[in-house]
Amino acid sequence: QARRREVKQLRETAAVVRHGDAVLVARRRPGEWWEGLWDFPRVTGAAARRGRRLGLVAYSVTHHRIECTVREQVVPRRTKPAAGQRWVKITGLESLAMTAPGRRIAAIAAAPERP
């Protein structure tokens, strides 16, 4: 009988970097889960605590259970994106090949603001 592998718990923070009606998305790099698909950038350190908390997305991938805090970070001007990143209108996200967690984050980002 095969032993079940232990599920590893991970926490991460996704940044919904917003300028006007556009958000910054990043293409998953070779060797990452969902290589080549678009997603919201993950941030660490001080950046992971910056901005308004929009919600939480939980998902599982290959013996990993991940809790992803979603934070909004509004920037005053649209900066040039890094390699593998681009600005997309929030309404244009549905046309991108996105990860499943990325789609859930997009739905949170597109939801009307709550008081």
Model-derived regions: residue spans:
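Intrinsically disordered, low-complexity, charged terminal extensions of DNA damage-control enzymes
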Residues: 1-115
